[in-house]
From Swiss-Prot:
Record CDD domains: MFS_MdtG_MDR_like
InterPro entries: MFS, MFS_dom, MFS_MdtG_subfamily, MFS_sugar_transport-like, MFS_trans_sf, Mutidrug-R_MdtG, Tet-R_TetA/multi-R_MdtG-like
Pfam families hit by this protein: MFS_1, Sugar_tr
Transmembrane segments: 14-34, 56-76, 89-109, 113-133, 144-164, 171-191, 219-239, 254-274, 288-308, 376-396
GO molecular function: transmembrane transporter activity
Localization, UniProt: Cell inner membrane
Protein name: Multidrug resistance protein MdtG
Gene behind the chain: mdtG
Organism from which the protein derives: Yersinia enterocolitica serotype O:8 / biotype 1B (strain NCTC 13174 / 8081)
Amino acid sequence: MTSAPQSVNWKRNLFVTWLGCFLTGAAFSLIMPFLPLYVEELGVSGHQSLNMWSGLVFSITFLFSAIAAPFWGSLADRKGRKIMLLRSALGMGIVMVLMGMAQNIWQFLALRALLGLLGGFIPNANALIATQVPRNKSGWALGTLSTGGVSGALIGPLIGGLLADNYGLRPVFFITAAVLFACFVMTWFYVREQFAPVLKKDMLNGRQVFNSLKNPKLILSLFVTTMIIQIATGSIAPILTLYVRELAGDIHNLAFVSGMIASVPGVAALISAPRLGKLGDKIGPERILIAMLALSVLILIPMAFVQTPLQLGILRFLLGATDGALLPAVQTLLIYNCTNQVAGRIFSYNQSFRDVGNVSGPLLGAAVSASYGFRAVFCVTAVVVLFNALYSYWCLQRQPLKAQQRAIQQRQDS
């Protein structure tokens, strides 16, 4: 990978894209607290039907995002990443307005699918920063950038719930659209990119993209790692509140306690991601990745044996601290092992695997808990992460980019 052009102020771009990721993360999570209520308002009734439709409108966005991501990644490699940020923010803003005007569940489902097709602000922001930042600061920069989306996702549900209580459900969609339009304007004026458009006939096809990689098997293993990270995170989500109730018994503030336990991993990730990313720049992101995967296994197993919500909350905080380092480490390794020419597609493929994990994780958690109980979910998830840690270690041991070579490249880029 070549060093970033000197005329591009990557630090300013990092700040602006961090703010954009924060606004995008907040916009997406603003509507999450009342999504089932909006489904009910659109005419769906009955416990079983409400659960089914709520699950559909939630998962269809990730499904269509996984389908569309490679196309947008290819277009980003042809036209540039900034235009993809603008396209995503504007497109999602328009869809949010239409969601606020939906009259039935089928319209809403179609718009949720369209939201997935037009999304992609955060992965394109990752690709933009990864191709501009000096290599010896990649881990810190991508770790810092990841905190933007996490921060937005943490604060979004709180604000969304307050807005829905005070103004109703539909106005929240219009407020969300306004946030996304603000993100569009900010990106338009303040993000800078030097990019020479590539003719379609000069673009590498999918086979050529992988042939151009230093280690295609390593890249594929990193895609799988991204998917399993999301599976591990998502598998716990469907059972968390019920597991807290099993631990705490009948308490009057179950929703508050569950919400706190659901939020603490994000807080931990905010603290750990930049620091572990910076450490990865010194000792290598591959060491951070393997260490955090192994630590995740050691944290997941005790979760199956906790006796109180406090114990679960402490372990969830520790798990969040490890998770905060995983995706930035994967992204840093991706950019170490591909060129700027194909970075957009590599990051988009990674996003597709992430979306597959977002869909399959809750399904795995629900299936395991239905058959074997809540505690079994943590054991199964630990086994999945352990397999991934061993597989990743094997692939990283075979990669051609050794620490000495990386140190030389870092000195050249800095």
